[in-house]
Regions:
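Short, well-structured N-terminal submotif of metal-dependent ribonuclease cores
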Residues: 1-41, 55-70, 113, 123, ...
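Alpha-helix capping/helix-boundary segments
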Residues: 10, 45, 86, 106, ...
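Hydrophobic alpha-helical segments
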Residues: 22, 39-42, 87, 105-107
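General small-molecule cofactor/ligand-binding pocket signal
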Residues: 40, 80, 133
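Phosphate/NTP-binding elements of NTP-utilizing enzymes
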Residues: 49
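ABC-type ATPase nucleotide-binding domain
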Residues: 52
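Active-site neighborhoods of divalent-metal-dependent phosphate/nucleic-acid chemistry enzymes
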Residues: 59-65, 74-120
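Active-site regions of enzymes building and remodeling cell-envelope glycoconjugates
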Residues: 127-133
């Protein structure tokens, strides 16, 4: 059973820059890994990765499709699709929520699935209407 949803940058840090994680985030991710317990990842995060690579904000040493496939096939990651329920929830987050559509979908995904979101995003953290690590 999935209990946590990873924000896009958290997955990157988990795999490449572990020191960027807070102590609480690192502890939770290590526990998940030790227990073989998967974390959720919104499908929109795959697009965010593709755009980061396209804009050269991150670099990878394999073709993009192969890299994204490796995320999908990772037993510690469960990709959660965008559903009509999540789309509707993303529109209900309110005017005080950040305008980034990807962040809206990620938070709506966590809310619809009853998951705790692991994020360092300040806008989401300030909103403070969801369980966070």
């Amino acid at each position: 059973m999935i209990s946590y949803l990873l924000d896009t940058h958290i997955l990157l840090w988990w795999r490449t820059e572990f020191r960027q994680l807070s102590k609480a985030q690192a502890r939770v991710l290590q526990e998940l890994e030790d227990q073989g317990q998967p974390a959720g990842l919104s499908a929109i995060s795959l697009r965010e990765f593709a755009m980061m690579i396209h804009r050269r904000r991150i670099s990878i040493d394999t073709p993009l499709d192969t890299w994204l496939d490796s995320i999908e096939s990772n037993p510690l990651i469960t990709i959660l699709p965008l559903t009509p329920k999540i789309a509707a929830e993303s529109g209900r987050l309110g005017d005080d929520f950040p305008r980034d559509p990807a962040d809206q979908i990620i938070v709506a995904t966590a809310r619809c699935h009853g998951l705790t979101l692991i994020t360092a995003d300040e806008g989401i953290r300030k909103w403070n209407k969801i369980k966070l690590v």
